[in-house]
């Protein structure tokens, strides 16, 4: 059976770079407070670009790297919790802006695990013969979903996009395995509310609070548990040793979470890719951004085995094993 391999990649961030010190202008916080609790030093915040704009720019780089035209793409999946609109989907907007007229396109919402979910879908559709060249994108403008008066949450997030091109292959490389899971019973630990139920047939009017509401302690316990389990599970399932893994790319949420998992597993810290100090938590974009940056910097090369592991709202989590 044919598999799916990565042949192109690209990342994009808005131009507006926000250092921790700038947050002190309107928040009771400090650079030291943010760094010591999260590891984050700066993030990019969009001023006039939508999620689709970020996705398009990352996709152009990925297509150029792959040596493909937009018309050669037959599938576009965008993982996002901050779409441009309820409808049309961000993926359809991206399809139009790229001129990918032969692609069918849709969004998925699996929060910070979204890129892993999209990877599984893209791989499955290529393996089934339903697609040949797929554009898989993680893109977010989380800045529009933040309560900028809540220092506990607004300092954590940033905007950005990462994209990869998958194509069918018979080579011994590509996406080897993807495991994803969900637990909706704990979904209230991380919520961005939707529109309130307002109608002329309902007494009173509700006020929308469509910004991120997070139980930090519960998310920490959840994240550390499922990250550890997901890494162990994929190693055991694929019968591969940690020594054979060149890098582990976790969702970039908080350095404390990553450091906790490193200690629990006893895996060398240098195997874990971290760049959240420069981007903050970009949700579904964090894993592809970290992947692209690692390849661009020469830290990953053809033939390397990597594990991607994510967790997020839903609750959702998952991991993928990839041979570049």
Swiss-Prot record:
Residues 252-256 are annotated as: ACP-binding. Its main location: cytoplasm. It catalyses: malonyl-[ACP] + acetyl-CoA + H(+) = 3-oxobutanoyl-[ACP] + CO2 + CoA. It comes from Clostridium perfringens (strain SM101 / Type A). InterPro entries: ACP_syn_III_C, ACP_syn_III_N, FabH, Thiolase-like. It is an enzyme of class 2 (transferase). The gene is fabH. NCBIfam families: fabH, PRK09352.1. The keyword Repressor does not apply. Catalyzes the condensation reaction of fatty acid synthesis by the addition to an acyl acceptor of two carbons from malonyl-ACP. Catalyzes the first condensation reaction which initiates fatty acid synthesis and may therefore play a role in governing the total rate of fatty acid production. Possesses both acetoacetyl-ACP synthase and acetyl transacylase activities. Its substrate specificity determines the biosynthesis of branched-chain and/or straight-chain of fatty acids. One of its GO terms (molecular function) is beta-ketoacyl-acyl-carrier-protein synthase III activity. This is Beta-ketoacyl-[acyl-carrier-protein] synthase III. The active site is at 112, 251, 281. It is found in: Cytoplasm. Its EC number is 2.3.1.180. It comes from the Bacteria.
């Amino acid at each position: 059976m044919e598999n799916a391999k990565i042949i192109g990649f690209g990342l994009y961030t808005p131009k507006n770079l926000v250092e921790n010190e700038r947050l002190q202008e309107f928040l009771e916080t400090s650079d030291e407070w943010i760094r010591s609790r999260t590891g984050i030093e700066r993030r990019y915040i969009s001023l006039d670009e939508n999620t689709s704009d970020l996705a398009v720019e990352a996709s152009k780089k990925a297509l150029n790297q792959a040596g493909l035209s937009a018309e050669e793409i037959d599938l576009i999946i965008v993982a996002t919790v901050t779409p441009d609109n309820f409808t049309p989907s961000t993926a359809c907007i991206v399809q139009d802006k790229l001129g990918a007229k032969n692609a069918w396109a849709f969004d998925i919402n699996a929060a910070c695990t979204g890129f892993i979910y999209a990877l599984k879908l893209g791989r499955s559709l290529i393996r089934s013969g339903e697609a040949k060249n797929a554009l898989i994108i993680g893109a977010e403008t989380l800045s529009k979903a933040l309560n900028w008066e809540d220092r506990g949450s607004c300092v954590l997030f940033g905007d950005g996009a990462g994209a990869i091109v998958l194509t069918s292959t018979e080579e011994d490389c590509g996406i080897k395995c993807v495991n994803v899971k969900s637990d909706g019973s704990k979904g209230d630990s991380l919520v961005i509310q939707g529109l309130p139920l307002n109608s002329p047939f309902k007494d009173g009017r509700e006020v929308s609070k469509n910004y991120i509401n997070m139980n930090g302690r519960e998310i920490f316990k959840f994240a550390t548990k499922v990250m550890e389990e997901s890494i162990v599970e994929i190693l055991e399932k694929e019968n591969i040793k940690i020594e054979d893994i060149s890098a582990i790319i976790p969702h970039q949420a908080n350095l404390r979470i990553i450091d906790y998992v490193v200690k629990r597993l006893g895996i060398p810290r240098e195997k874990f890719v971290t760049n959240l100090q420069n981007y903050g938590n970009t949700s579904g974009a964090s894993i592809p951004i970290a992947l692209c940056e690692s390849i661009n910097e020469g830290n990953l090369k053809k033939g390397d085995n990597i594990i991607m592991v994510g967790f997020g709202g839903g609750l959702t989590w998952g991991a993928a094993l990839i041979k570049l």
